Amino acid sequence: MSTPAILAEDLHKSFGETHALAGLNLAADEGTILGVLGPNGAGKTTAVRILTTLLKPDSGRATVAGLDVVKDAAKLRSQIGLAGQYAAVDENLTGKENLEMVGRLYHLGRAVSSQRADELLERLELTDAASRPAKTYSGGMRRRLDLGAALVARPPVLFLDEPTSGLDPRSRIGMWEVIRQLVRTGSTSVSYTHLTLPTILLV
C-alpha cells in the first residue's frame, strides 16, 4: 500500500486558551485534489501552516511527500508549493522576473527558470503583462502570478489558500484548469476555503 501524499494523524494545536486543532486526521493520495472546507476560525490556516512547516504542532504527526513536517522540514520545503490568500510577489519586479526569481530560489538554472516563467505566464493569461512591474497588476492578476510562483518548481504537493478569491468567473475557470493539469501529472493539491461546494463548482 502506497504512502499518502499528505497524511495527518491526531494533530493538536492551541494558542493560549484557544484550541485551533483538536485531533485533526486527514489523508490525500498522490494525484488528487483535497478540498478543506470550513468557516473562518475553523483551523484551516493553522492546519496548512503545520503541513507546510511554518508552524509546529503541539502533538500528533504529519507527513507530506513522505517527509515528516517537523523532522524533515528543511527538505520538505523544496517539495511543496504554497499560494496564499494574499499575493506574495515583489511589486518592483516584472511578472516574468518574479517567476524567474522563484525558479532560481529553487535552484533551477536560468534557462529553465525563464522557460517555465514563459509557459506559466501564457497558461495564466499574463503574457501581455510579463514585462510590466507587478505593482501595475490588478488584484486578480496578482493572484494568478502568485499561483504561477507556486508552480514554477512543479512541486509534487501544492497548497492553495482561497485560490479563486478576487477572481472573475473566467479567471477562476482558467486557474482551476491549470491546477487540474498539474494534478494530472501526478501532483497533489490541497485547496482550503470557506466557500461551500456548490459555490466552488459554479465558479
Where are these regions (language model features)?
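Walker A (P-loop) phosphate-binding loop of ABC-type ATPase nucleotide-binding domains
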Residues: P39-G43
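Conserved ABC ATPase "signature" region
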Residues: E100, R104, A111-A129
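Conserved catalytic motifs of ABC-family nucleotide-binding domains
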Residues: R154
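Catalytic Walker B motif of ABC-type/P-loop ATPase nucleotide-binding domains
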Residues: L158-D161
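Conserved small/polar residues in nucleotide/adenosyl-binding loops
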Residues: T193-T199
